[in-house]
Design a protein with these regions (language model features):
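Divalent-metal coordination cores built from histidine and acidic residues
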Residues: 1-71, 106, 111-131
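Conserved beta-strand positions in the central sheet of alpha/beta enzyme cores
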Residues: 33, 93-95, 116, 221
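Structural detector of well-ordered beta-strand residues that form the stable sheet scaffold
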Residues: 73-74, 95, 114-116, 159-161
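Glycine-enriched alpha-helix->loop->beta-strand junction motifs that scaffold or abut catalytic
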Residues: 88-93, 109-115, 155-157, 185
Length: 250
């Protein structure tokens, strides 16, 4: 919801916001995703800003309607302008967030909001978008290592994720784990972003993200030990999903 994005539902006003949430939930949505901000710039002081896609009334209406229906919402938000409004409205996850500032991080940490950084997609699109006249993703690439380190230090919870589009899906989606490790997480902590942390974010603790009796049998097998070589996650030899083998290296 929000902004002129293909196949997205636009709203104007709090009543339309509530109606849009209800419509999506009637279609069976478990989560609502909103596009919280747009038009990113880097200021002379090094901070990033953006334009908000929603008024506070619209944002709060989305949050209250979603949470009141016992569902959750995630926000595509790059800077404090989209992040703070979304978190205060009840967002459970901030998607991308590459231009977040310290106040955003502190608020997210205090409220237990997850950050889904989607680092590889930014790296993938940065050069191409810069050639087309939009260098903001290159700027994010330069600042994100310190942003990530600060967020971890301040206690922001990290969840692994990809994106709905923007890059070649045939490329290894596990590159984010290498970024996580190079910027301070241990290999175990990096893998937990896609297991126990993801389960917590999705409200499925005990069902996914761990190997134990009663949980879904979602298991992968590798030739190398990822605690010693995190890049081995980019070459998965065997995949089981809910007890069914989908990939078996011959």
């Amino acid at each position: 919801m929000g902004g002129k994005y293909t196949n997205k539902q636009e709203i104007t006003g709090a009543d339309e916001a509530r109606r849009a949430v209800r419509e999506q939930l009637e279609h069976g949505a478990d989560w609502i995703k909103i596009y919280s901000d747009r038009g990113y710039i880097k200021q002379p002081d090094g901070n990033y800003r953006a334009l908000s896609n929603f008024t506070l009334e619209e944002m709060n209406a989305i949050g209250s309607e979603t949470i009141g229906s016992r569902k959750n919402f995630a926000a595509h938000a790059m800077t404090r302008d989209g992040i703070i409004a979304a978190v205060n409205a009840g967002a459970k996850s901030i998607e991308h967030g590459l231009g977040m500032d310290e106040e955003s991080m502190q608020l997210m940490a205090a409220k237990g909001v997850f950050w889904c950084p989607t680092l590889f997609v930014n790296e993938f699109v940065a050069e191409g978008r810069a050639k087309l006249g939009s260098p903001i993703n290159l700027m994010f690439s330069k600042s994100i290592p310190e942003t990530f380190k600060k967020a971890v230090k301040l206690g922001v919870k990290i969840a692994y994720g990809t994106d709905i589009g923007g890059y070649d899906w045939s490329l290894p989606q596990a590159k984010d784990f290498s970024y996580f490790v190079s910027w301070g997480l241990t290999p175990i902590q990096a893998m937990q972003t896609a297991t126990v942390h993801a389960a917590e974010l999705l409200g499925q603790v005990g069902q996914i993200g761990e190997i134990k009796s009663g949980a879904l049998a979602d298991i992968i097998a590798l030739k190398q030990d990822p605690t010693k070589n995190i890049e081995s996650l980019q070459n998965i030899d065997w995949i089981m999903k809910d007890g069914k083998v989908y990939k078996q290296h011959k």
